[in-house]
Amino acid sequence: FSFSVVDVHNQRFGPYTTWPRDAIQAGLSQPHLGAQISFTGSLIENLNALAAGGVNGGMWNNWDAGYDQGGSWTTTLGNPRLDLVAFGYHHPLMPLLDEQDIRMQIRLHKHIYAQTWTGGPTYSRGIFPAETAFSERIIPALVAEGIDWVLVDNIHFDRACLNYPHTNQSGLFAPNAADQINPDPAANGGAWVQLNNLWAPSQVSAPFGYQPHYVQYVNPVTGAITQMIAVPAARYEGNEDGRGGYGAFLYDVVMDQYIQYNTDAAHPMFVVLHHDGDNYGGGTD
């Protein structure tokens, strides 16, 4: 059995270099179009090493230029169209780490980011925690490192509501009733929606499960409260989009099933399609 670490990277030359920039460039006529992309620090380190070593005739030289360019483009509101969000250096599951370790993972990531994109945008204020692994226990560490928002699987928004229609088919145990402190969305103008035309074994709440919310950690010793914004990552839609994108995910058909609940202009629904590049074999040349 032969295996080449270098070849694994070479097979992903497109997504590691220009594909994200190219996708955003195709939509520059749209006022708000953009994307958030995450690199582990160790992957950045690998790509820098490939460039420094002149691998394959220097094919990795300036691999970071596309991200630099994409980060220089702004939306009509002045936000970067390509946001390289914060991440742990070694792809850590942050809820399993202590506060010092979490902060060091982010600091190391900031360090290699600054080394790689010397003239690029300032470090992102948002984070995609590896594997979307989140716990309120990590909030103080994130906030201490200047992180304002975090992507959270939106099934956890739903599970924290009264009358959540749990099913074992979701792959999760029933929620702790003590955690269900939010009102039933269906009793407040929303609904529990059973999505069709994609794998979605549990109902989703609309609009609640698709709206950013403040989340907080209360220090059990001091009572000090630390808050940040949780951005809902659309669990089932992101999974389907990552599986195959156009053709696999029927965007309009699925989103039309809850768009009628997008009635609060001050707190609009926010459908984030989050996924890992290599899942289901995608993301390679």
Whereabouts are the PLM-identified features?
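N-terminal regions that are enriched for targeting/export leaders
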Residues: 1-50, 57-58, 62-70
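A short acidic (Asp/Glu
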Residues: 46-52, 96-98, 132-143, 155-156, ...
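Catalytic grooves of carbohydrate-active enzymes
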Residues: 196-285
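Glycine-rich, histidine-containing beta strand-loop boundary motifs that form or position
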Residues: 37-41, 86-88, 128-131, 145-146, ...
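Generic structural signal for well-ordered alpha-helices
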Residues: 20-24, 106-113, 139, 255
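Metal-dependent polysaccharide deacetylase catalytic core of the NodB/CE4 family, i.e.
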Residues: 41-130, 224-244, 268, 272, ...
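Acidic, His- and aromatic-enriched active-site or binding-groove loops in soluble protein domains
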Residues: 55-83, 111, 119, 143-215
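The substrate-binding groove and active-site-proximal loops of carbohydrate-active enzymes
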Residues: 2-15, 49, 88-103, 122-131, ...
